[in-house]
UniProtKB/Swiss-Prot annotation:
Residues 167-169 are annotated as: G5. Residues 15-22 are annotated as: G1. An essential GTPase that binds both GDP and GTP, with rapid nucleotide exchange. Plays a role in 16S rRNA processing and 30S ribosomal subunit biogenesis and possibly also in cell cycle regulation and energy metabolism. The keyword rRNA processing does not apply. GO terms for cellular component: cytosol; plasma membrane. Monomer. It comes from Maricaulis maris (strain MCS10). GO terms for molecular function: GTP binding; GTPase activity; ribosomal small subunit binding; small ribosomal subunit rRNA binding. This is GTPase Era. It is found in: Cytoplasm; Cell inner membrane. Residues 219-296 form the KH type-2 domain. GTP binds at residues 15-22, 62-66, 138-141.
Length: 314
């Protein structure tokens, strides 16, 4: 039996939408626990992933991106991000180093300017709360070292960061070192989850998130951000398999044919991809049935917020 005391704590991951927060959480855990797509603001609520480092359990809170909110859903998501940060033992601010470098040295892509503005918004938010964070420069694998050093120095001098790590969440470069460092910051205490549990997310919500990811991956250039997936039926069958019925909800009638596709081809492809991953995650055969609904006011319905732990009244 090890003489090393057990440790357990919470580490929040904050940053601009699409900075690579979800990819980093998955890399730290070693398994997929949160969805990753081309779309910004994919993570809508705080998802907890559970990473292990020796005798230490790190509960990673993958928060929604911090950005300038416009809708009720936006405001709820940003509030959830700061709530997750405020309750954590340590905070990681993930910055897309490539986007920041392109803004400074030329070759900027669409969305880079907004991402840098959102990063600065996080930095200012940390200043106001007087919380120290770990600066995680992500997507550094294709950047010149001199640019990285200058960038890290500039951000470190804001006074809100205790450490700087340079990583590539996608390739895994620098991730083990970051995991070990975070583990050293966790307080002594009993583990909150069994050793083999990698996520704290109800199965019904996890299933909806998996299908939502497939919707975005299949239709990311055609379907607006304003869509959601709801798990309506979850039935265990006699043979041990699962019957899952879900609705893909969009805001307008004109969006419904996009999700369905010609002859139902798009929704069929989404269903096949989702069913395959659900079977891997749940460890049983899954019978998945998808329906497409139009609900112009889904973002204004309190029940949708409550289901995923967002504050409707923020």
């Amino acid at each position: 039996m090890s003489d090393t005391p057990k440790r357990c704590g919470f580490a929040a991951v904050i940053g601009s939408p699409n900075a690579g927060k979800s990819t980093l959480v998955n890399a730290l855990v070693g398994e997929k626990v949160t969805i990753v797509t081309h779309k910004v603001q994919t993570t809508r609520f705080a998802v907890r992933g559970v990473a292990l480092a020796g005798e230490t359990q790190i509960v990673l809170v993958d928060t929604p991106g911090v950005f300038a909110p416009k809708t009720r859903l936006d405001k709820s998501m940003v509030a959830a991000a700061w709530s997750g940060a405020g309750e954590a033992d340590t905070i990681m601010h993930v910055v897309d180093a490539g986007a920041r470098a392109r803004m400074e040295h030329g070759g900027a892509k669409s969305g880079d300017s907004r991402m840098v503005e959102d990063d600065d918004r996080v930095t200012e938010g940390l200043k106001k709360t007087e919380q120290k964070a770990i600066l995680v420069l992500n997507k550094v694998d294709l950047m010149p070292r001199d640019q990285l050093l200058a960038m890290s120095q500039e951000l470190y001098e804001t006074g809100v960061y205790s450490e700087v790590f340079m990583i590539s969440a996608k390739t895994g470069s620098g991730v083990p070192q970051l995991r070990e460092f975070i583990a050293g910051l966790m307080p002594e205490g009993v583990w909150h989850y069994p050793a083999d549990q990698v996520a704290d997310l109800p199965a019904r919500i996890l299933a909806a998130e998996i299908t939502r990811e497939k919707v975005y991956l299949r239709l990311h250039e055609e379907l607006p951000y304003a869509s959601m997936v709801e798990t309506e039926v979850w039935k265990k069958l006699r043979d041990g398999s699962l019957r899952i019925e879900q609705s893909i909800i969009v805001e307008r009638e004109t969006q419904k044919p996009i999700v369905l596709g010609k002859g139902g081809s798009a929704v069929k492809s989404i269903g096949e991809a989702s069913r395959k991953e659900l079977e891997e995650v749940l460890g049983c055969k899954v019978h998945l049935f998808l329906n497409v609904k139009v609900d112009a006011k889904w973002m204004a319905r309190r029940s949708h917020y409550k289901d995923v732990g967002l504050d409707f009244d923020v």
